Amino acid sequence: MPELPEVEVTKQGVSPYLIDNRVTDLIIRNPSLRWPVPDIAKQIIGQTIRAVRRRAKYLLIDTDAGTTIVHLGMSGSLRILPINSPVEKHDHIDLVLASGKILRYNDPRRFGAWLWNELPEQAHPLLAKLGPEPLESAFNSSYLLSALANKKKAIKLCLMDNHIVVGVGNIYANEALFAAGIHPQAEAGKVDAERISILVAEVKQILARAIKQGGTTLKDFTNAEGKPGYFAQKLHVYGRGGDTCTHCGQLLSEIRLGQRATVFCSICQQR
């Protein structure tokens, strides 16, 4: 599943082609995504794209008339292509631009979203209750320590809770907890301030590094040019259950936590 770095890489890739460009058509070949794709051709055709933003794992394409909200789901991708590019399987939506380019949405599993919003952002149900961005200053050790106070849930589940902090999905939660030396099942409210400070720093560093290296390639992710990311080569624990720890040589343990694969080192990550 594309996580925050993959969506940020996508945003950086498509933005130069979209901003200040005029929409000339919207082609919806298959409206059956996670939610039905609304027929917004009348609203968006003729509009100039003013900004492209990311909020959590949502890509927001702003015009004066409203905002297109895109979520890549489990397997979605956005690519910039010439207007006459052949349509391939799972190419569900084209946003056609006056420049002669198209923004094409491809999604084999169709669990992503392409929605339209004319409300204030804080009033939209998908965006209203999101926590701070992990790469911004609002996400700091003081904030996280306060947010986790008295919480009995496992620290990994809290780290993946979008009400606490957005965009830290399974891959990067595994990696950040390993880097901080925190057991994923540790009770969140009992993790001390020093460890929380280290965890915040590791979340920021790991996400920033993944963005710089182009996102993580596991199965489906490609960037806006159709190229894979390369951060998978740098993963220490995610997807490596049963392999040896890169720090101590101990075999890595794998469990299910919140129905997600969780890999950790029982030596390096103490409760």
Swiss-Prot record:
Function in brief: Involved in base excision repair of DNA damaged by oxidation or by mutagenic agents. Acts as a DNA glycosylase that recognizes and removes damaged bases. Has a preference for oxidized purines, such as 7,8-dihydro-8-oxoguanine (8-oxoG). Has AP (apurinic/apyrimidinic) lyase activity and introduces nicks in the DNA strand. Cleaves the DNA backbone by beta-delta elimination to generate a single-strand break at the site of the removed base with both 3'- and 5'-phosphates.
BP terms from Gene Ontology: base-excision repair
This protein's name: Formamidopyrimidine-DNA glycosylase
InterPro entries the UniProt entry points to: DNA_glyclase/AP_lyase_DNA-bd, DNA_glyclase_Znf_dom_DNA_BS, Formamido-pyr_DNA_Glyclase, FPG_cat, MutM-like_N-ter, Ribosomal_uS13-like_H2TH, Znf_DNA_glyclase/AP_lyase, Znf_FPG/IleRS
Cofactor annotation remark: Binds 1 zinc ion per subunit.
Source superkingdom: Bacteria
PANTHER family: FORMAMIDOPYRIMIDINE-DNA GLYCOSYLASE (PTHR22993:SF9)
UniProt keyword Transcription, yes or no: no
Binding site for DNA: H90, R109, K151
ZnF (FPG-type) intervals: 236-270
Family: Belongs to the FPG family.
Keyword NAD: no
UniProt subunit comment: Monomer.
Cofactor(s), names only, from the UniProt record: Zn(2+)
Reactions this protein catalyses: Hydrolysis of DNA containing ring-opened 7-methylguanine residues, releasing 2,6-diamino-4-hydroxy-5-(N-methyl)formamidopyrimidine; 2'-deoxyribonucleotide-(2'-deoxyribose 5'-phosphate)-2'-deoxyribonucleotide-DNA = a 3'-end 2'-deoxyribonucleotide-(2,3-dehydro-2,3-deoxyribose 5'-phosphate)-DNA + a 5'-end 5'-phospho-2'-deoxyribonucleoside-DNA + H(+)
Active site positions: P2, E3, K57, R260
UniProt cross-references to PROSITE patterns, sorted A to Z: FPG_CAT, ZF_FPG_1, ZF_FPG_2
Alphabetical keyword list: DNA damage, DNA repair, DNA-binding, Glycosidase, Hydrolase, Lyase, Metal-binding, Multifunctional enzyme, Zinc, Zinc-finger
EC number: 3.2.2.23, 4.2.99.18
